[in-house]
Amino acid sequence: MNTIIKNLLFCFMLLILSACDEQNKTTNKETELVPKSAIEQINRQISEVPEDVGVHYYGLEQNLQRYSPLTQVNDGNVHQLKPSWVLSLGDNRGQQTQPLVINGVMYITSHNATYAVDARSGRQIWKSIIQYPAETLTCCGVTNRGATWYDDVLYRATPDNRLLALNPKDGKTIWEKRTAEIEFGYSMTSAPLVANNVVITGVAGGEFGARGFLDGWDPKTGEHLWRFHTIPKPGEKGSESWQGDEWEHGGGPTWLIGSYDKELDLVYWGVGNKSPWNMREGAKDNLYTQSMLAIRPKTGELIWHYQFTPNDGFDYDAVNDPILTEIEVDGKQRKVLIQANRNGFFYVLDRSNGKLLRANKFVDKVTWADGIDIETGRPIISERVKNMIKTGETTEIWPSAFGGKNLAPMSYSPTTGLAYANTFNIGWYYTPVKQEYKKGVFYVGAKFEWILPDEPKGYLKAID
């Protein structure tokens, strides 16, 4: 955890001290928001922490736990926190990025720029503009979710499918590589992951029928090392789970970052929806959509997979954060992967082999399945869904594509042993329809109407 302490300590103390010293006014521009005495106190506190630490990773660490051991901010003083500075990114698009903080510099991404900001003052150090074609296709809003730091280089993706290596001192591009073409619906929104000296990237585009993949890149040169397609072509393992030429436009996007276990040397990455969504009688499982993949970072070799929702019809993307931890299961300490899936079930997998250990509802209302069979690992499809597949009738389904949980990150505390997740309480009326593939057009094969309950539509939940 020492890789996050220095800069998080600074940020937390900055907020607390600015609140506590609210009465101390100053006209000095450098300390307009925080008194000089507070700055000196912060600097004294962080001086004991090594200079080379920071928030280097999306999710704070590569296990994606988002856990901080800091205790200064607690339920007794959290109400004192107030903003110390505000920085406008000059854009009205959604901001979903997680900043990085390295040696007092905060690195922030938006869809069309990368920023370096002095974390103490909010002063912009540099801004690197990203230009991309207006006709770039995106499913659900133009956004970017962050960058990653490795060996003194900043890596980020762009909406038009470029991977950039940036010099963190001035924001200039060291190298850039294109991963896919925009006319097929591909885009890139996630932060890259660096594992065993390989930069790994995923793509969005499942709603357009874009065939998903993961790429591995050399961090020094940008050389393309490997590609793993999430939809196998005929003759490849898993191709028997598709019919005819469905695989060509089968979806399987990889639009959120994965996690990494250095000891096992495995990258864990979730795969999203199949295209189109609609479920049909006689349809097969459609691997590796709605699955968790364990991949060797040097080669892209698939070691194991677990499919959460075979032949999914409801856009239950399995890309939600795969958090890594160790817990006791049936009296034995196990290295596990946990995920709050969009389909409304919370999963615990043995991350060495993909074996399902636990699966329970974490939202109140789940109607698409009656449960998960622990022996087979497969969902027990409800009678209402079986009838919908047979008749094509409009059916009330819970949860909706918003999921039991969507892309908002979950966290895990090894202190409490609990996971903390933002959850949804939204259903939909769903009708499967036939649809032919057309390049650059939404390819979902469904009509739907949201069901918004009178009671709260979302909750923060703690999950054992």
Language-model-detected regions and their locations in the chain:
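Blade/loop signatures of beta-propeller domains
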Residues: 28-83, 230-237, 381-385, 450
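Extracytoplasmic beta-rich repeat domains
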Residues: 87-98, 127-148, 176-191, 208, ...
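C-terminal motif of bacterial Sec signal peptides marking the signal peptidase cleavage site
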Residues: 16-19
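N-terminal cofactor/phosphate-binding cores enriched in small/glycine residues
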Residues: 61-180
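Conserved beta-propeller blade signature
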Residues: 105-109, 115, 154-156, 200-202, ...
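Short coil/turn segments that connect the beta-strands within blades of beta-propeller domains
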Residues: 52-53, 103-105, 151-152, 196-198, ...
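Bacterial signal peptide processing site
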Residues: 21-23
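Beta-propeller blade signature
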Residues: 166, 170, 212-224, 285-301, ...
